[in-house]
């Protein structure tokens, strides 16, 4: 199905082939994942469906052991990979947001390309709807993220630092088979959490304040991304009020998600609740984003997105209020859009 949609797009744009070099996009189509560093790793998909993977010679055996069953062209560091494939293309579709001007010139020289088109949106649209296999992997990543929060909460005590909690979570979760986090784990105490993308440091935990955890893990290349703001003791009334508003905004936004609903309308639901409570200026970001091979991917859950939710999408819902000197609260869940509504894949208590 993936390959068919690429070849259909090639025909639609009257192009000869697609040239894909983003490692995660290559993995999406081939099942082979590699970080080539400065070396070229590229997937060529021709209009007849044939696939050619260019890779360093040192990776050829790994490629052949992967699910990829197309042609493999390995090259030495002393060779120009493009010289090893003799073909001419009139029009080539590329990832326009990723292709460098230098690489474009090399493609023109090697393949005689006369014009370029964009394949980015087609790939984004494909990756936006997850297969059953992808969903199962994301679910497992979410279960492990829940476990991370559990580990972190159990480690809280007066005097512990943000950095110590981060280190404890990332060490202990390895016992569950986790080798990589989706992004740098965030643990922020009290008013330090009023910086939405703050950096954990030596701030010590005090009694009666909130603790914000924002984290995710990678399971078989798929990401989770969740946030919980938990009580340590009894936070003051103002901080609790902020928490209650954020929780209401998140719950009502999630309740509205189902196929056919306009994405911006869900952002509006959360934003209106926060604004009506008097905190609109303290909610400075979109409501959420797509989730899959990357922790942030297509589509944005924002007030400008007029697309509709579709079954198979996985998105985050993460309203927040950040009042300097008072508190920062964000609550985030990973949501699967189902045929009749939605399912929350993250489940740690709120």
From Swiss-Prot:
Gene3D superfamilies referenced in this protein's UniProt entry, alphabetically: Creatinase/methionine aminopeptidase superfamily, Creatinase/prolidase N-terminal domain
Keywords attached to this entry: Hydrolase, Manganese, Metal-binding
Residues involved in Mn(2+) 2 binding: 214, 225, 332
Enzyme class: hydrolase
Single Gene Ontology MF annotation: hydrolase activity
Manner of cofactor binding, per the entry note: Binds 2 manganese ions per subunit.
Enzyme Commission number: 3.4.-.-
Keyword Metal-binding: yes
InterPro entries hit by this protein: Creatin/AminoP/Spt16_N, Creatinase/aminopeptidase-like, Creatinase_N, Pept_M24, Peptidase_M24B, Peptidase_M24B_aminopep-P_CS
SUPFAM superfamilies membership: Creatinase/aminopeptidase, Creatinase/prolidase N-terminal domain
Keyword Manganese: yes
Cofactor names: Mn(2+)
Residues holding Mn(2+) 1: 225, 289, 318, 332
Pfam families: Creatinase_N, Peptidase_M24
Signal peptide: none
Family assignment from sequence similarity: Belongs to the peptidase M24B family.
Protein name: Uncharacterized peptidase SSP1059
Organism annotation: Staphylococcus saprophyticus subsp. saprophyticus (strain ATCC 15305 / DSM 20229 / NCIMB 8711 / NCTC 7292 / S-41)
